[in-house]
Amino acid sequence: MKVVAMKKIIQLIFVAMLAIGFGSITSAQMSGPTKVVYHIDDAETQGLKGLRNIRNHLDVSPQTTIIVVTHANGVDIMMDGAKDKKNSVEYAPLVGALKSRGVRFEVCEITLKNRNLKKDQFILDTDFTPSGVVRVADLQYKDGFAYIKP
C-alpha cells in the first residue's frame, strides 16, 4: 500500500514539474516578437532560396528577429563577389538589403579554419561565431528561436 501511494506522489510531482516547465517555455515563446534562426550550410542548394525566404518572411512579418547562421559551404553566400551558380545572381546585394532590415548574418569560424578562409574574404559587416552548429543550438534552446532550414 505504501509503495503504491509513493508511486502516485512521485507521478504527481513529475506531472507538476512538466506542467511548470512547459508553461515557462510556452510563455517565453509567446512573449515579444517572433525570433527565427535560418540555418544555411550549402550555398548552392539553400543560398538564393534562403535569402528569398527571409525577404518574404520580413515582408509578411517585419517585426521578426532573424539571425542567419552559416557554416560549411553555406558560408559562400557571405563571401565577397560570390554568386549563385545556377543564375549568376550576386549574393552581396541581397544580403545587404536584408541587413538593412535588421537581419544578422553569422559565419562559422571552424569553417574558416577548415577551408583556409580569411575574414577579409567576406562582405562587409559579416559577423562571426566560434561554431555555427553550437550557435544554432544555443539560439534554439537558450534563446527560444524557431529553426528554419531552407
Feature locations, PLM:
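Bacterial N-terminal signal peptides
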Residues: 13-21
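Short hotspots in intrinsically disordered terminal tails
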Residues: 2-3, 147
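Signal peptide-directed secreted proteins
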Residues: 1-2, 26
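Secreted/extracellular ectodomain signature
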Residues: 26-150
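Bacterial N-terminal signal peptides that target proteins for export
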Residues: 3-13
